[in-house]
Amino acid sequence: MTLTISDLPRDLKKKIFSRIPLRYVRALRLTCKEWETLIKSRSLKIDEEESQMVALMDYNLCLMSKSFNGGDPSTEIKGKLTCFDEQVKVSMLFHCEGLLLCILKDDNTKVVVWNPYLGQRRFIQVRFSHIPGGWDQFSYALGYYKNNNMMKSFKLLRFFDYFYTSNDFVFYEIYDFDSGLWKTLDVTPYWRIRFFDDIGVSLKGNTYWCAKERKPEWNADPFIIVDHIICFDFTSERFGPLVPLPFRAMKESLVTLSCVREEKLAALFCRDVVVEVWITTTIEFDKVSWSKFLTFGVRDCPMIYSCTGSFFIDEVNKVAVIFGQPLKRDKVFIIGEAGQVRDVDLGEPAHQDSWLYVCPYVPSLVKIKQPPGCKRRRQSSSENRRYKRNMMRLVELEKYHIAMEPKRGDKTI
């Protein structure tokens, strides 16, 4: 009697499937219903010993793995992810439920949402761009709500926020994958999200950022960077209240957020020569509670302050994996509970203005809804009026900034 894979115990089949490269698993799904069920199961997609990450390195996307076998953490670059032509570069990355939102470096007319596992992608045309100095001034977030059929319907949030005393200007808009339309949101921010921390973290369909209370300059504490987090709810399309971080981050300190197994948030706080990692015990739209997870000294690793906004933790072995760019090199710092530090050199990027950003990645069967066909809806007249008003204000703002720039030949004292 010939033994086939179908005759093997279910647990053994799970182990076999978990070691098959993603590019082959898609074909296996079509073989039989049992195999498709196994592939869809969470136990197959999440491996506690070895998990996957997507890294933005040198304007390219790479698949990485992090392993905690035997409590000895390690990272490895598996290879380059290709969604576009080799010449297309990615400047910003956002992850949500296995989907990657890619902001293109040299094309400010569109963004791309990509599912590497299914090989699906969708190009989304943006209504306008704002790139003074050559840098995209927008913040982005990808999230979803559950429709009447309990299916995930995705949306894209896009905004920028100037909070200068005399020239406050905000523009928040959201794109609905179902309708294929943009909508201007009526937002009056009572918060400030740091520009260099604006990638945010996706958790259960919503997005969280580090933030602080919005105050006029004369009434604000100039030394506080952030002391709260804020959530955008994609169901209600609104921001929640500021909820406190377990610390107040002052200047010369580092704060960044991460997601823990798609269930909790973690906050990394570096001050002086001490690093603290906190994990949420409760996390909701309008409330949060924290528990300290790790505290360790980094006297032997002052370069930890070059962290570029990416870190992961292993709750079982109490290890933090932090990504940084000291001395213009991409590096991984692996820090244990006792404060021991090991660093892995990933090399020098070819583009010195690029930055290293890493996000967790779990293969997903979520399909990207494609644009409506011939029955595409049109923007409402009221939305068109709101959009035109904002465009007029933006033009005036850009003129103001051009006028304020030093003239060529002016001496700077």
Curated annotation (Swiss-Prot):
Kelch repeats lie at residues 156-202, 331-379. This is Putative F-box/kelch-repeat protein At3g22870. SUPFAM superfamilies: F-box domain (SSF81383), Galactose oxidase, central domain (SSF50965). Residues 2-53 form the F-box domain. The lineage of its organism: Eukaryota, Viridiplantae, Streptophyta, Embryophyta, Tracheophyta. Gene3D superfamilies: 1.20.1280.50. Keywords: Kelch repeat, Repeat. It comes from the Eukaryota. Pfam families: F-box, FBA_1.
